[in-house]
Amino acid sequence: MRTIGMSDYTVGEDCFTELPGALAEYGATKVAIIGGKRALAAALPGIEAALEGTDVEVLEARVYGTNSTRANIAKVVNSPACREADVLIACGGGKALDTVKTAAIELKKIVFTVPTICSNCSAATAIAVVYNDDGSLEGYSYPNRPAHIFINPKIIAEAPAEYFWAGVGDALSKQPEVEYATSAGNLEHTAGLGLALAHTCSEPLFTYGVQGLEDVRQNLSSEAVKQIALDIVVNTGYVSNLTNQNDYYYNSSVAHAFYNATCSIPRKGTYLHGEVVSLGVLVLFAYTGDTENLERYAAFNKQMGLPVTLEQVGLSEADIPALCEYAHATNEWKQGNPESFTDEKFAAAIKAANAYGHTLLA
């Protein structure tokens, strides 16, 4: 037996007006709101205004911390307000949302999400990333998918532009990773549906990405910003839920194996998830020998200011042996879809992608 649930979503600058009705569907009269400091400053006024005059009580609005670590997850789990609430409203980027989603497993709570940045698809997914206290990857948790997503393009447009930029970088991975991971064929219905939806993920980025980034840099809510937010949150989020089930995993591949391995490499600088993943996409195309897409995606990376070389994310070819070693511990390497990964091929792909990137910067 398989049951698939997908998040409802509301998009628009007036999206919070739908919040009371969405809560009523679950009989919810008590909520706790959890998020990052900036996220709460951006979203809380609109949420509180929407709930004013209703029978919904806000028990608490709390800052979760700065990363989705076990310590921060425990703070949510141990909060009396979060224990009493009918619904947890998670506001912020992926780390804030993943913290609340993971805490909700133990609390057995319904989660609504408010992505105040669109740096990844966490607002829609039944998967969450958990980090160690030092920032390295611990692994994944598998919560229920959020019940409802509230996407406010104005809030996203007024957030720091680098998160929108990195979100485009992360979303670039969804279509090629799923296409590669499923390329052995013989997919059952749910995975096949995920693959079909994955085919919709890249083109909106190529169409609206440059304009959307320009608009966000001017804090301008626009059609391009809305379309990118929908693609990052909804398209890629739905794909994640359909391609990640108990009996199969096609949700990520070489690009995320690369990213996850980089988390264990000590280096100067701070690099956003999607920033590094976008370089991992080039590694994926080098790995599969897809020169046409390597060149297309690399050109788009350059146009967007996303990385095309190792040096742009604080790495060098001297780090490749360590990247191979750390990649062994990643879920993507362990899953090995559509076939087992090899150190030799992975190392060669990193070198090839890096070499091609250098030709673009020459």
Language-model features and meaning:
Residues 24, 52, 56, 135, ...:
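Generic secondary-structure signature for well-ordered alpha-helical cores
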